[in-house]
Amino acid sequence: MEGEEYDKILVLNFGSQYFHLIVKRLNNIKIFSETKDYGVELKDIKDMNIKGVILSGGPYSVTEAGSPHLKKEVFEYFLEKKIPIFGICYGMQEIAVQMNGEVKKSKTSEYGCTDVNILRNDNINNITYCRNFGDSSSAMDLYSNYKLMNETCCLFENIKSDITTVWMNHNDEVTKIPENFYLVSSSENCLICSIYNKEYNIYGVQYHPEVYESLDGELMFYNFAYNICKCKKQFDPIRYHELELKNIEKYKHDHYVIAAMSGGIDSTVAAAYTHKIFKERFFGIFIDNGLLRKNEAENVYTFLKSTFPDMNITKIDASENFLSNLQGVTDPEQKRKIIGKLFIEEFEKAVNNIDIDINKTFLLQGTLYPDIIESKCSKNLSDTIKTHHNVGGLPKNLKFKLFEPFKYLFKDDVKTLSRELNLPEEITNRHPFPGPGLAIRVIGEINKHKLNILREVDDIFINDLKQYGLYNQISQAFAVLLSSKSVGVRGDARSYDYVCVLRAVKTSSFMTANWYQIPYDILDKITTRILSEVKGVNRILYDVSSKPPATIEFE
């Protein structure tokens, strides 16, 4: 989306895994954001209609050699033009370094939810953790060397309390505030938690307001965009796909579209919109890789044919090819690469059986913006957690033109589009299922026996969640088969069977997540049923890990 008609917030990426959540926060308040890497050249931004700048967090230490920094001329341009700057975590530390402050390793690293005190001259006596920072016996002593404001900093305007809960994730902290900066918040373990410069309209926070666990995070972005940057012109991010579809419509008479269809919401909604344009020149391909859930291959194909009776859809059974190539493979990234490679090979074989001109063919993908960010930030800035199946497995010599109408949208945006299309609720509310399928839910080596055990466990778990009315309250739920076995008793005999883990999480973004507290009586019923009906399992565990430090999937 070009967005010239909108007031822009420039978001500069220092490699944060939460980077896309900044964009999402801005989308939520109808602000257009332009994203660039930290090393952007001045010539590339001077002609933009920039109303403000946000500096993201990142996995580096700002004081280490080779860590990412803004170009000096770019930072000085922001100061010269007095473009408001909002630094988040690493971004705040970058501001401190650029303006002759100091950053050092934290004595106490902070991770997760933390209460932050918003500071003013009239409320510092309420601070109770003074002795955490040396010998200060009172708040007056503690803050005597810092400039405090008489009024609440405008970044925190309309926050109802002087204490707000935020998401922390840092090892370093600012230890010396640059000259002419105010100290505007502190936490129990981080004295300099937020800073503000009135002359240049610069704001820095050590925490992550973009993460949904930061209770007043969206309000901070609203204050920055509308009250500080004075943005006025709004845009509707969910209409992005309309522009993409309009751009591709000119090809509908002499081009084709092919799509890998899984039955998931992203690929299904993308196919529904694109099929409306290309009609008989649209071809959907559903590949059964042998790694799907119980009866899923047949159920998905039947669903797609009944929902889109006029759509060309081909089903390919490639299960034996996938399973034979995965034999003996235990490393999860290797599994993903093998599956990605085989998928492309099978897909290309299927396409070659269709009478179309490959040079005039688009490959439709339901890639979402979080897919791109979580897999790999530009220039390897961000630590790669996992290769995403939509963006990690595509070959460099891809023969098709790539069409990704949802690449700047988020999951809830696609759900809105699904409802606009009146697609069945089973699609709109379907939990995410990874591209590599059960390959990354069977820990270690994969074989048919393990897959069948996992299918039965997962089927009982999901169906019971639906029966008890919990499924739609949960963001994602699934079962995992561990590689280890445990000793048990069946009847009077010893058993030595697999251990299964049940996982259910609640999340708004899938970048952070909390484990879902299934009522104990329901969890007991589900567990009892699994152990009674599924052979090969004698122990069930329930995962109570949040993300971070865990990821949602095990592999």
From Swiss-Prot:
Pfam families: GATase, GMP_synt_C, NAD_synthase. GO terms for cellular component: cytosol. Changing N390A: No effect on ATP pyrophosphatase (ATPPase) activity. Increases glutaminase activity. Loss of GMP formation. Gene3D superfamilies: 3.30.300.10, 3.40.50.880, HUPs. Changing C113A: 2.9-fold decrease in affinity for ATP and 1.9-fold decrease in affinity for XMP. GO terms for molecular function: ATP binding; GMP synthase (glutamine-hydrolyzing) activity; GMP synthase activity; magnesium ion binding. Pathway: Purine metabolism; GMP biosynthesis; GMP from XMP (L-Gln route): step 1/1. XMP binds at R336, Q476, K547, I552, E553. Changing H20A: Slight decrease in affinity for glutamine. 1.8-fold increase in affinity for ATP. Slight increase in affinity for XMP. Moderate reduction in glutaminase activity. This is GMP synthase [glutamine-hydrolyzing]. It comes from Plasmodium falciparum (isolate 3D7). Changing E213A: 40 percent decrease in glutaminase activity. 1.4-fold decrease in affinity for glutamine. 1.3-fold decrease in affinity for ATP. 1.8-fold decrease in affinity for XMP. The active site is at C89 (nucleophile), H208 (for gatase activity), E210 (for gatase activity). It comes from the Eukaryota. Changing E555L: 20 percent decrease in glutaminase activity. No effect on GMP formation. The record marks D371, H388, H389 as: Important for ATPPase activity. The gene is GMPS. In absence of glutamine, can use exogenous ammonia to aminate adenyl-XMP intermediate to form GMP in vitro. However, this is likely not physiologically relevant as at cellular pH, ammonia is present as ammonium ion, which cannot serve as a nucleophile required for the reaction. Catalyzes the conversion of xanthine monophosphate (XMP) to GMP in the presence of glutamine and ATP through an adenyl-XMP intermediate, which is the final step of de novo synthesis of GMP. The conversion of XMP to GMP involves the coordinated action of the glutamine amidotransferase (GATase) domain that catalyzes the hydrolysis of the amide side chain of glutamine producing ammonia and the ATP pyrophosphatase (ATPPase) domain that catalyzes the synthesis of adenyl-XMP intermediate from ATP. Homodimer (via the GMPS ATP-PPase domain). Changing Y18F: Slight increase in affinity for glutamine. No defect in glutaminase activity. Keywords: ATP-binding, Glutamine amidotransferase, GMP biosynthesis, Ligase, Magnesium, Metal-binding, Nucleotide-binding, Purine biosynthesis. The glutamine amidotransferase type-1 (GATase) domain hydrolyzes glutamine into glutamate and ammonia where ammonia is then use for the amination of adenyl-XMP intermediate. Upon binding of glutamine, the GATase domain undergoes a conformational change involving an 85 degree rotation, which is required for channeling ammonia from the GATase domain to the GMPS ATP-PPase domain. The GMPS ATP-PPase domain catalyzes the condensation of XMP with ATP to form the intermediate product XMP-AMP. ATP binds first, and its binding is required for the subsequent XMP binding. Its cofactor is Mg(2+). Residues 235-430 form the GMPS ATP-PPase domain. Residues 8-234 form the Glutamine amidotransferase type-1 domain. GO terms for biological process: GMP biosynthetic process; purine nucleotide biosynthetic process.
